[in-house]
Amino acid sequence: GLPRVAVDLVAPPLVHPHSQVAAGAPKVVQFRMSIEEKKMVADDDGTTAQAMTFNGSVPGPTLVVHEGDYIELTLVNPATNSMPHNVDFHAATGALGGAGLTQVVPGQEAVLRFKADRSGTFVYHCAPAGMVPWHVVSGMNGALMVLPRDGLRDAAGAALAYDRVYTIGESDLYVPKAADGNYSDYPALASAYADTVAVMRTLTPSHAVFNGAVGALTGANALTAAVGESVLIIHSQANRDSRPHLIGGHGDWVWTTGKFANPPQLNMETWFIPGGSAAAALYTFKQPGTYAYLSHNLIEAMELGAAAQASVEGQWDDDLMTSVAAPGPA
């Protein structure tokens, strides 16, 4: 008897339109995700990886509901795919997060409904028996945000709001190399499996990236904002720990494990995301320019690719920073 609303998902880093404060009673929110197996380019050198994706993107799209709502997901595995797939929602209770009820072989679809009974940002990922790590690091992960019905709050209970929201999915890739030292290119998922798992077992990623590829969120693809705008960043890592840092900025309010029932930490320089979780960080930009948002494991950021940029427009505030003397002879 609850009202129903269908939501069209969008590809990261964007998030589908939503209200920050719930309007009315709980409802059933309907989503549809189609699984796509495809080859993706991992870096500027043209390195390829056989990927498995929700809706064709890495990470998959971010879903947003309010606490008390019901999520009704139709999961589609087209006949053009080769593998069985499912979905485990870390926000869900029972049946392996839904994985036990959503296993679909190519040509099948399943519908899962569960109650969003706690607020926060949560990871979801594919979890087929015997192949979980391979599917997860091959791209099948994303984030779900369950907002409190009255919106975000600080530790004192004052309302917090955001002007923009972006979602960043951090991935560790394990691309095998051929005997000549160059990265291998595989024609299909099955042909990549054994070599990829062998690299995975070294626990040494070939790439550590935001949103599927080196440079996916830099340059022309940078996040955008304006001075005075408050931006919420949802950052998920389905497999390994991460240490996000905004160079030239901060985390004004940070839910490091993403759970909005817990008070946010204030004025963070770097925050910690345990593998298998999603954090939420809110920052109001105070200066224009190009910011770097990266993992402060700097080797992963600068050598393996775990970095993004934010391009911020507006007027410079000399009170916050000024050049007293330009570089010159000593």
From Swiss-Prot:
It catalyses: nitric oxide + Fe(III)-[cytochrome c] + H2O = Fe(II)-[cytochrome c] + nitrite + 2 H(+). The keyword Oxidoreductase applies. Its cofactor is Cu(2+); Cu(+); FAD. Residues 1-165, 166-330 form the Plastocyanin-like domain. Its EC number is 1.7.2.1. Cu cation 1 binds at residues 85, 126, 135, 140. It is an enzyme of class 1 (oxidoreductase). Pathway: Nitrogen metabolism; nitrate reduction (denitrification); dinitrogen from nitrate: step 2/4. Keywords: Copper, FAD, Flavoprotein, Metal-binding, Nitrate assimilation, Oxidoreductase, Periplasm, Repeat. Cu cation 2 binds at residues 90, 125, 296. GO terms for biological process: denitrification pathway; nitrate assimilation. One of its GO terms (molecular function) is nitrite reductase (NO-forming) activity. NCBIfam families: Cu_nitrite_red (TIGR02376). Belongs to the multicopper oxidase family. The type I copper site in NIR plays a crucial role for electron transfer from pseudoazurin to the type II copper site of NIR, which comprises the catalytic center of NIR for the reduction of nitrite. Homotrimer. This is Copper-containing nitrite reductase. It comes from Alcaligenes xylosoxydans xylosoxydans (Achromobacter xylosoxidans).
